[in-house]
C-alpha cells in the first residue's frame, strides 16, 4: 500500500493519478475535507481507502499497524503563504511532519515529502544549502525548519555510522496545473487569468509583473519527479522546478494565445504582500540532475497550453 497525505490536494491528487496510470490503486488517501470542494480531485481516481487527517495522525502517534506500506508521500500541509497564525502553521507543517517521519524511520518506510521554494526567501541563488535560505513568511519558515530537522537526523546518523531509510524532500517552485480549483487565492496565476478570460475580462496582472519572474513548473512534471525518486530510492532535499524563470507576462501570453483574444491589464500591487513576496525564483537543478533524475520539464508555453486545453474542455 502507498499512503498519500494531502491526497485530495493539487499535488497529492496528481501523484495518485500518476500512480493509477501505472496500475497502482492500493492507495490510502489522507486529507482534511473541511474544504469539501477538494473531493472533485478524487472522483476520477482509483484508491483503496480514505482517512481523515486527524484520525490518521492519532493512529500514527499510537503506533498502529497499517499493514505493509511501500511508501508515504507526505503532501499534506497548510500551504497558504498568506497565513500568519504561526502556531497553527508550525503544528500542521512541522510537528505533524516529524511524527510521520519517525513512524517511517522506525519501520524503514520510504518518506517523500513536500518542502518548498518558499524556504529561500529573497535571493537570486536557489541551491539546496542553508546559507541560501531565509523564508519571508511563516509557511516558508515551517518548511525550512522541517528541512533542517531532517538534515540534523542525517548528520547524527553519519556521526554514528548509521544508515537511515529513504527521506526525500522536494522544494516545489511555482506549481500550476489541473486539480487546483479548490485553492482560491492560492491557485496559480494561470488559473486566475483563465477564469478572468472566461468571464469576458482581460487578464489582470499586478503592476510591475513584467519584472517579476518565477520558476513555473507543471504539476504533471512534479508528479513524475516524485515517482522517479520512489523508483530509485534516493535520499536528499531537491529543488523541483524547471530551472528557468519566466515572467508573469509569459503566463498571460500563453493564456491569451489559447483563447485567441485579450490583452494584459495591470492592477495595483496589494499592500499585504509587500515585503513577503518573492519577486524571483529559479531552481538550480544541479543536485537533482546529479542524483540521476532525468525528468524533462515543460516550459510555460507548453505547460499552460496543455493546462488550458484540460480545464476548458466542454
Swiss-Prot record:
Keyword field: Carbohydrate metabolism, Isomerase, NADP
Coiled coil (UniProt feature): none
Gene3D superfamilies for this protein: NAD(P)-binding Rossmann-like Domain, UDP-galactose 4-epimerase, domain 1
InterPro entries: Epimerase_deHydtase (IPR001509), Heptose_epim (IPR011912), NAD(P)-bd_dom_sf (IPR036291)
Matches recorded under Pfam families: Epimerase
Gene Ontology molecular function: any one: NADP binding
Binding note for cofactor: Binds 1 NADP(+) per subunit.
Cofactor: NADP(+)
Pathway per the UniProt entry: Nucleotide-sugar biosynthesis; ADP-L-glycero-beta-D-manno-heptose biosynthesis; ADP-L-glycero-beta-D-manno-heptose from D-glycero-beta-D-manno-heptose 7-phosphate: step 4/4; Bacterial outer membrane biogenesis; LPS core biosynthesis
CDD domains documented for this protein: ADP_GME_SDR_e
Annotated consequence of substituting residue 271 to E: In strain: 169-98 / Serotype O22
Binding site for substrate: 174, 185, 192, 206-209, 214, 277
SUPFAM superfamilies assigned to the protein according to its UniProt record, in alphabetical order: NAD(P)-binding Rossmann-fold domains (SSF51735)
E.C. numbers: 5.1.3.20
GO biological process: ADP-L-glycero-beta-D-manno-heptose biosynthetic process; lipopolysaccharide core region biosynthetic process
Effect on the protein of changing residue 161 to G: In strain: 169-98 / Serotype O22
Active-site residue list: 139, 183
Residues given in the record as NADP(+) binding sites: 10-11, 31-32, 38, 53, 75-79, 92, 143, 175, 183
Catalyzed reaction equations: ADP-D-glycero-beta-D-manno-heptose = ADP-L-glycero-beta-D-manno-heptose
Functional note: Catalyzes the interconversion between ADP-D-glycero-beta-D-manno-heptose and ADP-L-glycero-beta-D-manno-heptose via an epimerization at carbon 6 of the heptose.
Family from the record: Belongs to the NAD(P)-dependent epimerase/dehydratase family. HldD subfamily.
Subunit structure, as described in the record: Homopentamer.
Entry's free-text remark on domains: Contains a large N-terminal NADP-binding domain, and a smaller C-terminal substrate-binding domain.
Protein name: ADP-L-glycero-D-manno-heptose-6-epimerase
Biological source species: Vibrio cholerae serotype O1 (strain ATCC 39315 / El Tor Inaba N16961)
